[in-house]
């Protein structure tokens, strides 16, 4: 596991130096504290920071082929590299190390950029081909590892994290208004844009080739068609799933350093621990956290699973300095990020790193097996589709606007009047379209956003291209392309890497993902039972039923309590002149939101947290590059790369950002 960074110029005699590449690498030392390597020649510079996992003494990068005409830096783990190496040796290739990195560069010699289609694992890589003066960038199929790039003044910059690019090209710190809008809508910035107009994310499953000053990107992998194979019986389905997931877990146990697993006591992590216990010769090291407030302490469930599988269990009940943690995380995150579960992810990574260098997790189970409540809720509301369209439109356009604003079920009433895909989008939105209360966005900010794209179009485009007919399968596809990548996997990567910990995700092995996608949706969501077949597998491998059929909580944390106590003073920055003078939000709207939460007792946690993360990102990250940062620093026209002919404007979508919850 590493962090990578570099730059390739169209000019052979450019001023790319080792010092410049070193400076880029310095920004991400925590991603690889064990080693640094740099290659500079002919207008190209590649750099890496290494966290040693495999071949501890021989894993230095960059790595080259036999005649040193191709060089690679790479972040990730390739689990099928022993088989690939044997094939390459059979074709006459010679190796000097036992690393997966060297396998990739020899595979590139044989197959060119398409070599990535042979890789099984997680990766973000950069290959410089001296003969062709070409740079190849590639990102793994599901987006487990990040990769950013920017073309600026004839130079192609790339890096695991944006801060490496900004450290040598600070003029690229032009804030992307479209990204800010999408953050406020989703709580994250969806691929491929970033918070900076000139810097982009390479999407999962994509290649980029840079040659002669031109960028060419192409997709090398896509989720397959859903619902293509129906098992003859539940037993057959369980046998196949068990074999595939056990094998995906086994290959992720290869390591030359201590290895363990996150254990929350939920279905996903418990299943992975059960499979690890079967595949391991000794006790599995497991890690769980809880909080001192009893309502947010799930450590007892993890304890039950740990006892069942005789793990070497490590547990920590926390009463953290949450203010200090929030300050630290927002100074490290390069984009506003609104998922508060980054806090427990950071804490469990911090604890695990005291004992291991690699941890397996159960991430991906919800998106693959329909684990979120919103899938079940969506299915329940499909009954309203039997109401004629004219009747739903009449209710939405004529009756609904006359209902009392705070009528119980008003949001539900509006939501079920929408077409099913729009209903799901509205359900996800932080800023639901049905509310027209006191606006939160300033008039000036909405005017800028009016030139941009309706953020809901991100999901609409994925719905349009989903290789699925059943609505549940379409929802799983959309979430895999958006929420999984830009929220869940981003969170896991950033929080684990801040602690120099590698996290591996067996459920998101692409062979498992492809097979599970092909299952009929009723194997995932059956009636009200979410993750049906995964729970049955968990029972089969010994996870106690009391763990499997309790209410899902995930990484639970006392955020409401913190925001009325430990974080209360921090929240007050939202009312400071410095914040309001940025020009994004209407002062009256922010004050009402805060009063509702702190004075009237309404739970506005999600919205306030999202605004707090937005402001702290400005203070702790953005203002390193843009001072003062605010509405005045936005470009005149918002990013328009997501425009489509049928796209309503952002202003139409969010004409009045609501304050009420």
Write out the residue ranges for each language-model feature.
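Short beta-alpha connecting loops at secondary-structure transitions
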Residues: 165, 288-289, 335, 379-387
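Glycine-rich loop motifs involved in handling phospho/adenylate chemistry
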Residues: 259-268, 293-294, 340-343, 368, ...
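Short secondary-structure boundary/capping segments
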Residues: 330-332, 373-380, 628-629
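Short hydrophobic/aromatic residue motifs in ordered secondary structure
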Residues: 35, 146, 269, 365, ...
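Alpha-helix capping and helix-loop boundary segments enriched in small/acidic/polar residues
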Residues: 293, 317, 336-339, 386, ...
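Active-site adenylate/phosphate-handling loop in enzymes that bind or generate adenylated species
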Residues: 141, 347-407, 483, 488, ...
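Cysteine-centered catalytic environments shared across enzyme families
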Residues: 1-333, 345, 349, 540, ...
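Adenosyl-5′-phosphate
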Residues: 1, 41, 167, 198-204, ...
